[in-house]
Amino acid sequence: MFTFNQYSVSFFTNIRKLTFLALLASFAAFLPGCDNQRIAQLEEGVSTEGDVRIKFGEPEKIWDGANGAKIFEYNRQPAGTQNYMITIGTDGKMSALRQVLTPQNFAKIAPGMMMEDVRKMLGKPMKITPYELVNEYHYQWRFMDGANESDKKIFTVVFNTDLKVKSTGSAMDPALSPNGPN
C-alpha cells in the first residue's frame, strides 16, 4: 500500500508546477506567431475597430488618444516580450498598430514623467515591486533586444512615492541565467 508523506506530496507539487510552467512557456512561445498572423491581416486606414477586436479580442485597456482617437492596449506580459498599442481614429478605422516595447520608446522615458504616461507609452508591466524602505516602486517589462532568445531583457522604470520616474535601466532577463530566475 502506498502512503503519502511530506516528500511524496512535495514531489507531486513540484511535478504540477513544472507541468504548468512548461505549458505556460509553450503558450507564450505560440503567441508571437499568432500576433504576426493577426497583424498581417490588418491594414492601417482600412481595417475597422471591429476587425481589430475580431483579430485581437478585447483590449486590456482603452486610452484616450489625440483628436478623439482611441488607443487599444494589448498586453503580452508577463511571459511575452511585446505590448501593442492600436490606434482607432474617429472614423472607426485603425490608424496605427505599434509594438511599443522597444529601446526607442524606452529612451523617451525621462525623470519626472508620471506613471500613467509611462503606462500609456509601454502598456501594462509584467511586474510591479514596491520597495517601501527606499520609497520606490519598480515597474518591469520583458522585451527582445535582438532576434535571438538570448536577447531577452528586462526594462525597469523606478518610480518614487509620487509615482514620478526616478530612473530607468535594462538588464538581461534573469530567466536566461544558468541558475534560473532569483
Could you describe each region identified by the protein language model?
Residues 1-32:
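Sec-dependent bacterial lipoprotein signal peptides
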